[in-house]
Amino acid sequence: MVVDCHIHMALDGGYWKDALARHKEAPDEQFIRKTLETYKSLGFTYLRDGGDRWDAGKRASELAPEYGLCYRTPLFPIYRKGHYGSFIGRGFETLNDFRALVSEVKARGGHFIKIMISGLMDFNRYGVLTDEPMPGALIRELTNIAHGEGFSIMAHANGDAAVRGAILAGIDSVEHGAYLTDETLQMLAESKTVWVPTLVTIGNLIGDARFPEEATRPLLAYQMAAVRKAADFGALIAPGSDAGAYRVFHGQGGLDELALLRRALGDAADEILARGTAEIEARF
């Protein structure tokens, strides 16, 4: 039994614009079925999608029982207009806008809420993020709205400020979590927030000429050390690959992520990851 707590059915591990184009008229059911069959053949039992605004993840969730898979989706990620997330999500400007999107997720059968509260890791420049973090007060407002509607929350979050904001707001899981300090890792361990580090999004870039290894190698080393520290502190950690991201292929990406987490966590890896996975499955 294998799980992947962060995938994107709308993407395919190649160029994102080409991948999304196949779903823009309607979700590409042939692609979705082939991908679900891949997961089934590799022994996966649980998948959690990060969402897309073309309903590829939604269609996958409808088809997944045919393949013996539990598949959870937020329908689409929600981002603050003017900040990261426009390529795949739905945007809001006001809290009323956000409430309306949450209501839409509920009405259309989404399983949880996904929000974007930071930028990306800059894979060309070590130590750099591509956008400012969402203010902590706004993160709390969004969390209260979503929790008030009975939803758990998955948050794309990089950097200390965004992840601390997520922890303090009571967000259920944080994805990626680049460049966290020991203090933030300790906060994570003292909270109920689950960290899904998506190490393979970095690891699978090493050896690719697109990004300089003087950026990707130290970034992977930093993240693997942070995962080890977080586990030592007692944090909840779960495996998620961000499958569909560049060079993270469906199915194999989840196995690659598990291999990196086992390298980082050592002999206790499976026990540590089982704790985090149980929390994800229970809440999402």
Predicted feature locations:
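Acidic/histidine-rich helix-loop elements
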Residues: A10-P27, K81-F92, N124-E132, I206-A215
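Glycine-rich anion/phosphate-binding loops
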Residues: Q30, D52, R90-A100
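Active-site environment of divalent metal-dependent phosphoester hydrolases
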Residues: H8-D12, D49, R53-G57, Y79-R80, ...
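Histidine/acidic residue-rich metal-binding segments in metalloenzymes
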Residues: N96-M116, M121-W195, R217-I237, E271
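Divalent metal-dependent hydrolysis catalytic cores, especially in the metallo-beta-lactamase
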Residues: E29-K58, G68-I78, G110-N124, S152, ...
